[in-house]
Amino acid sequence: MQLNPSEISDLIKTRIEGLKAGADAKNTGTVISVTDGICRIHGLSGVMQGEMLEFPGNTFGLALNLERDSVGAVVLGDYEHISEGNEVKCTGRILEVPVGPELLGRVVNALGQPIDGKGPINAKKTDVIEKVAPGVIARQSVSQPVQTGLKSIDAMVPIGRGQRELIIGDRQTGKTAVAVDAIINQKGKGIFCVYVAIGQKASTIANVVRKLEEHGALEYTIVVAAAASDSAAMQYLSAYAGCTMGEYFRDRGEDALIVYDDLTKQAWAYRQVSLLLRRPPGREAYPGDVFYLHSRLLERAARVNAEHIEKITNGEVKGKTGSLTALPVIETQAGDVSAFVPTNVISITDGQIFLETDLFNAGIRPAINAGISVSRVGGAAQTKVVKKLSGGIRTDLAQYRELAAFAQFASDLDEATRKQLERGRRVTELLKQPQYQPLQVWQLAASLYAANNGFLDNVDVKDILAFEKGLHDQLKTKYADLINRIEDTKDLSKDDEAALRAAIEDFKKSAAF
C-alpha cells in the first residue's frame, strides 16, 4: 500500500481545523474583585482547596475559600496589575518550594526564591509546603541533646533533638538572641539550621544574617524571610515553607533545627487573610482554626525512626534516625501568657523558656525565669555530665528567688538562710552570659562543678564572671587532656572529677582573676 503525501497533509489540516483548543470551563474563571491581595473569582468549579492559580503576568495565587458560586484566593506577590475581568486558570498543582543542600547559606522568600542577590538556586528537588506530620509509629523518643551553648538553658531547660521548645516573652527581652545563639552553637555538630523570620523589619533580618555570616553559621543555615513589608499571605506561608526545607534533612537521616521568629506575627497575618476572606471571627478576632494553624506546623517537628526514613528514601538511607527540632518564638503583651495564641502554643510544645522584662532590665541576660521555664522531654536527652551537675542549680535558683522576696522584709536572718541567699546571688551571676559567646560542654561542666562545690562562695559577686573566664582559660592551657576526656565521653568519671577539683583548687590559689 502506497501513501500519498498530499493525502496525509490534507488529513492533518482537517484534524487541526477541527481541533477544539478551548480550555475546560471548569478550570478557568474570571476575577470579580481584587482588594488587599485577596481575589474573588467566578467560575473555577473544579478547583481544589490549596491549589495554585495562575493570574496574568506570571503571578500565582492560592485558593483558600471554596464557596458555592465563587472562589476566594490570596495572591502571592504583587497584585496591582490584576484587575476585574482578568482570566484565572487552575494549575492542578499544590504550592511547592525548592528543598535540598543547595539552599544552605542562602536567604529566600516564602516561595523559596532567592532574595540575597547571590544568583539563582539550582535545587534538584521541590516539595509541597503542607504535609501530614509523622504518625506515632514513625516516631522515636527524644534521647540526643541539642546544645544551645547557653548555661541557663543547657543546665535547667535542656532541649533534645526532635523536641519543640517555645521561647516566650515580651518584646525586647532577648528571644531572637537566644535562638541565634543556639544556631551559632551548632557549628561542627552536624545539625542543619533553618531561621524563619516572620513579619520583622528588613533591617533586623539583615542584621541577623550578618551575625550568622560573621560567626560562620550561614554555611549550614537557610534563612526564610517574610519581612513586615511582604504581604500577609507570604508571612503566613513562610513558616510552612521553612518547615518543608527542614523536613528534607530530617527525612534523610540528618538532624535539623528550625526557628520560627515569631509565630505571633504569623497568627496576625493569618487573622488578616481570614478576615479579608470574610471568614467568621472568634476570640480576639482570630479565625476558628488558629490552633490548627500552629499545631499542624509544630507537629511536623519530630524524631523519626530508621524504618520511616528507609521507607521515604526507598531504601537509599538505612539505619539512621532523623530529627527536626523546633524553637517557636511567641511575643507576649505585658507578660500575659494567658492570651489566646500564647496558651495555644504552650499546649502544643514540649516546654517553654520564659524570658522576663524585669530580669532583662536588671542585667540578668539571658533573662530566663527558672521557676516557670520547663522542658518536658529534654531531661532524657541531657548529656550525662551536665545532668549530674545541674540538679542543684535549678533548686538553688528557685529557692533564692523565693527567699529574696521574703528577705526584703526581714532584718535578722539565720545563718542557713543567709548562706542560701549568698549562694543564689552567685549562681544568678554565674548564669549571665554575653551574646554570641556559646559555651562548650566542658566549660559548662567546669562552671557548674565550681558552683555546686562551694568554690564560688568566697568570691565576690562582681568577680564571678572574671573567675569563670580565668578558670576556663587555665583549664584550656594546662588541662587539655581532662577537657578532651569530658568532651569525648560527655561524662565525669571519679578520676576526672578529682582532677577537675584539683584544677579549680590550683586556680583559686593562683587567684588569676
UniProtKB/Swiss-Prot annotation:
Q: Where in the cell is it found?
A: Cell inner membrane
Write the record's keywords in alphabetical order, separated by commas: ATP synthesis, ATP-binding, Cell inner membrane, Cell membrane, CF(1), Hydrogen ion transport, Ion transport, Membrane, Nucleotide-binding, Translocase, Transport
Which enzyme class, named as a word?
translocase
Which molecular-function annotation in GO is an example for this chain? ATP binding
Catalytic activities: ATP + H2O + 4 H(+)(in) = ADP + phosphate + 5 H(+)(out)
Gene Ontology CC entries for this record: plasma membrane; proton-transporting ATP synthase complex
Which Pfam families does the record match to this protein? ATP-synt_ab, ATP-synt_ab_C, ATP-synt_ab_N
Membrane topology per the entry is: Peripheral membrane protein
Q: Where is this site: Required for activity?
A: S373
- The entry's ATP-binding residues are G169, D170, R171, Q172, T173, G174, K175, T176
InterPro entries given in the database record = ATP_synth_asu-like_sf, ATP_synth_asu_C, ATP_synth_asu_C_sf, ATP_synth_F1_a_nt-bd_dom, ATP_synth_F1_asu, ATPase_a/bsu_AS, ATPase_F1/V1/A1_a/bsu_N, ATPase_F1/V1/A1_a/bsu_N_sf
Q: Which residues form the signal peptide?
A: none
* Superkingdom of this protein's organism: Bacteria
EC number of the protein: 7.1.2.2
- Has UniProt tagged this entry with the keyword Nucleotide-binding? yes
Protein family: Belongs to the ATPase alpha/beta chains family.
| Annotated function | Produces ATP from ADP in the presence of a proton gradient across the membrane. The alpha chain is a regulatory subunit.
- Assembly information from the UniProt record: F-type ATPases have 2 components, CF(1) - the catalytic core - and CF(0) - the membrane proton channel. CF(1) has five subunits: alpha(3), beta(3), gamma(1), delta(1), epsilon(1). CF(0) has three main subunits: a(1), b(2) and c(9-12). The alpha and beta chains form an alternating ring which encloses part of the gamma chain. CF(1) is attached to CF(0) by a central stalk formed by the gamma and epsilon chains, while a peripheral stalk is formed by the delta and b chains.
**Mind telling me which PANTHER family this protein's record contains?**
ATP SYNTHASE SUBUNIT ALPHA, MITOCHONDRIAL (PTHR48082:SF2)
Which protein, by its recorded name, is this?
A: ATP synthase subunit alpha
User: By which gene is this protein encoded?
Assistant: atpA
